[in-house]
């Protein structure tokens, strides 16, 4: 789509109103060329629990309803393929607000500096202390339970993780 940047906000408004009906929200909107056609990809997550497993029927129904709504959208005159999909179980946590929503979730976090001899930690994000502006994560290191406090500014990268 040559004009994707100019119509992305309008597509987002249309999609948001439809996705709310299915308790979904937009995680990311992408446009790329694949299989010899333009693809409009809308990655979604649950509104209340960002890392909750999504109902396949909700994704299909929202895709169909969104397809109908975009059919007469003037900015999409060229042929394209619509893909509404889950953002994924190990999706990146991109902001402080998203990290706050991840409290009580199992996450992977990479810090700018080592804490307890490690800069990469996988564990349960226990808490966000508003007064101290710090997060607390609990994890196991060599069989021992550890807790570490960190500020969002110390985070190099964070994502949801799967505990095995």
Curated annotation (Swiss-Prot):
Cellular component GO terms held in the UniProt record: cytosol
Pfam name, any one: RimP_N
SUPFAM superfamilies for the chain: YhbC-like, C-terminal domain (SSF74942), YhbC-like, N-terminal domain (SSF75420)
InterPro entries named in the record: Ribosome_maturation_RimP, RimP_C, RimP_C_sf, RimP_N, RimP_N_sf
Protein keywords: Cytoplasm, Ribosome biogenesis
Record GO biological process: ribosomal small subunit assembly; translation
Gene3D superfamilies hit by this protein: Ribosome maturation factor RimP, C-terminal domain (2.30.30.180), RimP-like superfamily, N-terminal (3.30.300.70)
Location within or outside the cell: Cytoplasm
NCBIfam families registered for this protein in UniProt: PRK14643.1
UniProt-listed HAMAP family: RimP
Function: Required for maturation of 30S ribosomal subunits.
Assigned protein family: Belongs to the RimP family.
Protein name: Ribosome maturation factor RimP
């Amino acid at each position: 789509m040559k004009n994707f940047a100019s119509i992305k906000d309008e597509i987002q408004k249309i999609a948001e109103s439809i996705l709310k009906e299915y308790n979904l929200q937009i995680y990311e909107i992408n446009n790329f060329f694949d299989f010899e056609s333009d693809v409009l990809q809308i990655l979604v997550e649950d509104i209340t629990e960002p890392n909750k497993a999504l109902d396949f029927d909700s994704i299909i129904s929202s895709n169909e309803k969104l397809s109908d709504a975009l059919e007469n959208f003037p900015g999409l005159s060229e042929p394209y393929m619509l893909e509404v999909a889950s953002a994924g179980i190990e999706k990146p946590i991109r902001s402080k607000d998203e990290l706050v929503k991840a409290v009580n979730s199992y996450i992977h976090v990479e810090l700018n500096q080592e804490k307890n001899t490690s800069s990469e930690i996988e564990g349960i994000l226990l808490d966000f202390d508003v007064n101290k502006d710090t997060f607390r994560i609990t994890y196991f290191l060599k069989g021992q339970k550890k807790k570490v406090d960190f500020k969002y500014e110390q985070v190099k990268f964070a994502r949801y993780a799967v505990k095995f």
